[in-house]
């Protein structure tokens, strides 16, 4: 099965960002992609770089016109879309990703682990996610999501693997020359859980902050299953064979050889 990561920048014009995303979905679908993922908070500029209450106006409800545009694109192109966005839900705000399956909202993941770092003031804007770690049953396979910092906490990906995920999308908004760190972390998660993990990173300049892209898909043997992207807008293609996942799981047996009775300290 062919999947794609849409590595793109996002500016202050939300409508333009939406239109660009929809356009790139069509191109990815023409290339044969059946599942298409986007970077973290892909519809907005990188507002968490500082604390600014006026930026809450950038949030969208799941029922908003912006999200509906991607629902329509999912129907038109008959694809599954993993769309990260700034979510407004009643009086709470989340760093979220909606999974759209050929026009159907398959579900929503809300980022669990929120950094509070220079240029990443996420705890000011977002409530920690309350969705736990769902696996979305779609027409193109079982999909999990771990948003940016979530991927540096291995428990989430392990839960997704235990619950039957075939693919984990890892949308990020990474800068500051951290590519080597992310390549190691994502590849290790893919290998330790014998599944596919697609890291889709943001690109572009945003108020002095540079996002470097370099998106890639790691496979269940710890290998690269896509070309490593550059630092410009791009569509990254990966061709997956689920037999590879099954073979890796059978060979290494990480999940079936676990010893949960010995892991009590991890939740203290």
Give a label for each model feature.
Residues 96, 108-110, 170, 227, ...:
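Residue-level detector of high-confidence beta-strand sites
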Residues 7-14:
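Short polar catalytic/cofactor-binding loops
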Residues 1-4:
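Extreme N-terminal starter segment of soluble prokaryotic enzymes
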Residues 14, 23-102, 106-108, 175-188, ...:
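Cys-nucleophile CN-hydrolase/nitrilase-fold catalytic domain and related Cys-dependent amidase chemistry
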Residues 59, 65-80, 152-235:
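CN hydrolase (nitrilase-like) catalytic-core segments centered on the catalytic cysteine
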Residues 60, 88-163, 175-184, 250-252, ...:
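Active-site catalytic loop in hydrolytic enzyme cores
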Residues 83-85, 96-99, 134, 199, ...:
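Short beta-strand scaffold segments in enzyme catalytic cores
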Residues 243-268:
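A conserved C-terminal secondary-structure "cap"
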């Amino acid at each position: 099965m062919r999947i794609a990561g849409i590595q793109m920048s996002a500016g202050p014009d939300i409508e333009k960002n939406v239109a660009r995303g929809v356009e790139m979905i069509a191109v990815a679908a023409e290339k044969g992609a059946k599942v298409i993922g986007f970077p973290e908070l892909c519809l907005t500029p990188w507002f968490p770089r500082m604390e600014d209450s006026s930026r809450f106006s950038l949030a969208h409800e799941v029922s908003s016109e912006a999200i509906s545009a991607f629902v329509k694109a999912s129907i038109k192109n008959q694809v599954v879309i993993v769309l990260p966005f700034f979510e407004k839900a009643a009086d709470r705000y989340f760093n979220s990703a909606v999974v759209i399956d050929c026009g159907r909202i398959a579900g929503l993941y809300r980022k669990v682990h929120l950094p509070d770092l220079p240029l990443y003031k996420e705890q000011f804007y977002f409530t920690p996610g309350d969705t736990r770690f769902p696996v979305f049953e779609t027409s193109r396979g079982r999909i999990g999501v771990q948003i940016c910092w979530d991927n540096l906490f291995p428990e989430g990906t392990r839960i997704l693997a235990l619950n039957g995920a075939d693919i984990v999308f890892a949308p990020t908004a990474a800068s500051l020359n951290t590519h080597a760190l992310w390549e190691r972390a994502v590849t290790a998660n893919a290998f330790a859980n014998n599944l596919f993990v697609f890291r889709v990173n943001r690109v572009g300049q945003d108020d002095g902050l540079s996002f470097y892209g370099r998106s890639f898909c790691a496979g269940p043997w710890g290998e690269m299953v896509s070309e490593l992207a550059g630092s410009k807008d791009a569509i990254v293609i990966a061709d997956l064979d689920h037999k590879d996942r099954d073979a890796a799981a059978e060979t290494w047996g990480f999940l079936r050889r676990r010893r949960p009775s010995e892991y009590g300290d991890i939740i203290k």
